[in-house]
Amino acid sequence: MRKIYTSVDLGSDSIKILVAEIYNKKLNVLAVSNVKSSGIKKGLIVDANEILVSLREAISEIEGKLMITIDKVIASVPSYYSTFEIVTGEVDIDEYGKITGLDVVKVLQKAVKSKLKMDRELVTIIPIYYIVDDKKNIKDPKNLIGKKLGVKAMMATTPSKNVQSIISIFQSLGIDVVDVNLGSIADYNEFKNNTSDTGVSAVINIGHDITTVSLFNKGIIINSEVIQIGGKNIDNDISYVFKLDKKDSSKLKENFAVAHKKFSRVNDVKEAVTTNRDLISITQYDISQVVMSRLTEILKLAKKQTYLLTNREISYIIITGGTAELPGMSYLVEEIFGSNVKVGNIDTIGIRNNKYSTVSGLIKGINDKLESRDKEYTMIDLDNDASGQNKLSINDSSVLNKVFGYFFDN
C-alpha cells in the first residue's frame, strides 16, 4: 500500500496544504498549496466564514493539481494553554506472549484512561519508553516476548475549543480530520536529528503574528509557550518608518531586506510609493536596519522564554517559520543564541522553505506513529487497493480513536 497523506497548517497569514507520499522512509511531495488566509488571528479562528473561503481555495488548488478529492486531512492545532503530563499504563499480553501493535495501542489507551479533564482535548501521546516485564527503557516492544507491557509516556492536551473549532471548519466542507498535532511537535519532527534526540532542545517558530517556543527532552516535548509577536510586527515597523501600506512593506521585507544589516548593500535601492502618493527611494541598508531591530527583539524574547521554560542547559536550538528565510538570518541568531543554534533547512524538493516545516512534520509524525503501532494507512488510495492485512479500519467508538482524539474514520 502506498502511504499518502494530506496535512494542513492554518496560519494567520496563509494556509499551507501538503499532499505527500512516504516511500523508503523519505517524504516525496505530490502537491502543495499556499494561499493567503483570513479569519485567523494569533493562530486562533476568529471568523469561520472568512477562513472557509481561504480553505476552499487552497483545497481546490490541490484537487486541481492531482485530479482527486480531498476528504481526509491531518491538521495542526495551536499551542495556546497546552499542557504536558507524564502518564503510565500497563496491560497483560495474551497467551502467545508476543507483543503486537495492538498491544501498543492498548497500553497507550490505558495510560491516558481517566486522566483527561472534561474541558481538555487529547492532542497526542508520545511514548518515552516501554517496559516488558521488568525490562525498562525499551523503545520498540513489538515482537518481544513477555507477560506484561508497560509504558511511560507524555500526554499532550489543549483546550477542547482549540481542536473543536478546527474540526468543525473541515466538517463543514465534508472533510474528516483524522489526526491532529501541535505545530511545534510537527516542526520538531521535521528537523530532529541525533543531536536533538539526545539532549534538551528548543524549537522556535516565528510566525506571522505569534512566535512559539517549545522545549524537548530527548525528542519528547516538555513545555511550550506562545509570544505575542511575529513577522507582522516587522511589516508594521517598515510601514511606519517609510510610510508604506502593509502589503508593500511585507513584499519589501521578503524580497529586498536582509536579517542582518552587516550583509546589506547601501547602493542597492528600491523605489516605493508611500501612502501619501510620494515616490521614495529605500536602500537595502536602511530597511534591513528596521528589520534587524525587530528581529533582534523577537529572538531575545524567545531566548528569555527558553530560560523561563527550563533551567537546564539547551544543547540544540532550531529556528523555523517563514521569517527564518530572510537572508543573513543564521548570522543574527548566532549572535543572540551562540553556536548551538541553526536555522531550519528543509531539503525536500517542492517545499524548500521553512514556512512548510509544520505540514511536512505533520506527515512524518503520523507515519512514525502508525509504524510504531504496526499499521498501514493511506488518505488517498491512488492504487484503489483495499487489501492489506494491517490496514486501519476504525470507527468513532474504537479504542484507537479514543486514545488519539479524532484519529481515523474510514
For each feature predicted by the language model, list its residue ranges.
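Nucleotide/phosphate-binding catalytic cleft detector across ATP-hydrolyzing
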Residues: M1-S14, L18-S201, D245-K246, K251, ...
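Extended, folded domain segments that form the structural surfaces/walls around functional sites
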Residues: D9, N193, N205, K304, ...
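Glycine-rich phosphate-binding loops at beta-strand->alpha-helix junctions
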Residues: D13, A259-H260, E313-V333
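Short, charged, surface-exposed secondary-structure boundary motifs
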Residues: K42, E190, N236-D237, I349-Y356
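Short glycine-rich phosphate-binding loop at a beta-alpha junction
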Residues: I68-S79, L309-T323
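Short, surface-exposed connector motifs at secondary-structure boundaries
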Residues: K148-G150, N217-I221, L309-Y316
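Acidic, glycine-rich loop-and-beta core segments that form the ion-binding/anion-interacting portion
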Residues: N193-K261, R265
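Glycine-rich phosphate-binding/hydrolytic loop that grips phosphoryl groups
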Residues: K342-G388
